[in-house]
Amino acid sequence: MSRSNSIYTEDIEMYPTHNEQHLTREYTKPDGQTKSEKLNFEGAYINSHGTLSKTTTREIEGDLDSETSSHSSDDKVDPTQQITAETKAPYTLLSYGQKWGMVAILTMCGFWSSLGSPIYYPALRQLEKQFNVDENMVNVTVVVYLLFQGISPTVSGGLADCFGRRPIILAGMLIYVIASIGLACAPSYGVIIFLRCIQSIGISPTIAISSGVVGDFTLKHERGTFVGATSGFVLLGQCFGSLIGAVLTARWDWRAIFWFLTIGCGSCFLIAFLILPETKRTIAGNLSIKPKRFINRAPIFLLGPVRRRFKYDNPDYETLDPTIPKLDLSSAGKILVLPEIILSLFPSGLLFAMWTLMLSSISSGLSVAPYNYHLVIIGVCYLPGGIGGLMGSFFTGRIIDMYFKRKIKKFEQDKANGLIPQDAEINMFKVRLVCLLPQNFLAVVAYLLFGWSIDKGWRIESILITSFVCSYCAMSTLSTSTTLLVDLYPTKSSTASSCFNFVRCSLSTIFMGCFAKMKAAMTVGGTFTFLCALVFFFNFLMFIPMKYGMKWREDRLLKQQRQSWLNTLAVKAKKGTKRDQNDNHN
């Protein structure tokens, strides 16, 4: 009696949410019976179309002689059937809960970057008196922090994409702690300006690199939720910083602010050193591969249960990105000058710069008539903005993920029906930016009302409500823009994220530097009216990349491929000419 194996393979297209644990598939066994089987999608991977797929191979072993003789003999033996499933290695070994744990760790690291600027605002008046400087001079320390907050990530992002996320984050936090100690003990105003630059250079890259980390362990259908949450939670320091700074300054003095930053960031540094894993896919794959360099290894992976959970003894080497990373410190600039990128980011950066002015206006506007609020009460007035930012980062991520799933499903259906070419790619600019437009136009109205509320001394409720809406829109804008960049450049996600960081911080620096003169010339209400008009106009520019962005990218790719082909031909021709010359010489 002979035995035979029957093998077939199927490719399953899936669009699961985190609570869809299985899919059911039907198949026919050798005895003719139809069976159903639940398939776990832990081994799912992203296919060339950007959708989640899983390849399952079943081997059905049975007694085929018994099956063929079943019609001629009643004394037959039931076939022994064995079903095994072989799947591709999972994209990441992190569970859904562990992904949120990573978001918490990244928020803990990057929070100190956004906190470093607003926590300093309540101390400005004390610095003026202690060091005998005027308002313009004391604002220099605010401007230089914002300036290096935009410049530093464009360099550090390239380092993180080359050498790994973990060492750059840890190095930045350590520099921040050392600079904060120096600021707490600073003897002169010149030292404060210098150390504020160092402080910003150290911690600023953590925001962009955090988005790169999230891009390492998420797929497109879930990326909006996690990137949005990380980006939004990290920047909540700008909402609550003034409240914390006001309490510390009122209870002690301005030096207490920097001791607080030293202790807080130092504690987070120790936690991150112990548990933050390396996620760069060229180094760690799906987290099952042990990094070669010691600095890329988290000590927690020395524990037996953690090693077994992340398969350190049986790594999935096929998940290792074969791309050899090359250090290119100008890569952020090369991305930023692309027309579809700058047209997508500039309106959002302008909106975010207005949010920075709004936070500054609350501090300065509520401290004078007709409000004359105490420093701590002003800090409490930042709470609605903090809550709005928290809601904006959380809900927007889920909204853009839901919209992406719906659009990719329709896209695949149209492709299957022959309505679009099989090699077509979904328009990521349109899928992401269409979610950005409503909140950007809503923000124009909110900022306009906020500016005139401060200017005319309207009831405090109007200021609190509009600051809530403005913060919601600002965090929504940040989440969507960052997600778009990670989608477009998954292998350079830290560098790409730093582009928006550069745009928003550069614009914030310019407007903060000009804000005092603009208020003197146009009043607060007039200043916000002018900026709202700019945002309203530039919002329409986003329709250009929505329509032409993918075409421009495809044209550049074809041009690069053509140039590469010509270079290859030139090299071969040169070698052939040299060979002919050698033959003639011989």
UniProtKB/Swiss-Prot annotation:
The chain crosses the membrane at residues 100-120, 140-160, 167-187, 189-209, 226-246, 256-276, 335-355, 375-395, 434-454, 460-480, 524-544. Residues 1-44, 61-82 are annotated as: Disordered. Keywords: Membrane, Transmembrane, Transmembrane helix, Transport. One of its GO terms (cellular component) is cell periphery. It comes from the Eukaryota. Coiled coil: none annotated. Pfam families: MFS_1. Residues 19-40 have a biased composition (Basic and acidic residues). The keyword Membrane applies. Residues 121-139, 188, 247-255, 356-374, 455-459, 545-586 are cytoplasmic. One of its GO terms (biological process) is monocarboxylic acid transport. It is found in: Membrane. It is a multi-pass membrane protein. Its main location: membrane. Residues 1-99, 161-166, 210-225, 277-334, 396-433, 481-523 are extracellular. GO terms for molecular function: monocarboxylic acid transmembrane transporter activity; threonine efflux transmembrane transporter activity; transmembrane transporter activity; xenobiotic transmembrane transporter activity. Probable transporter that confers resistance to short-chain monocarboxylic acids and quinidine. Belongs to the major facilitator superfamily. CAR1 family. This is Probable transporter AQR1.
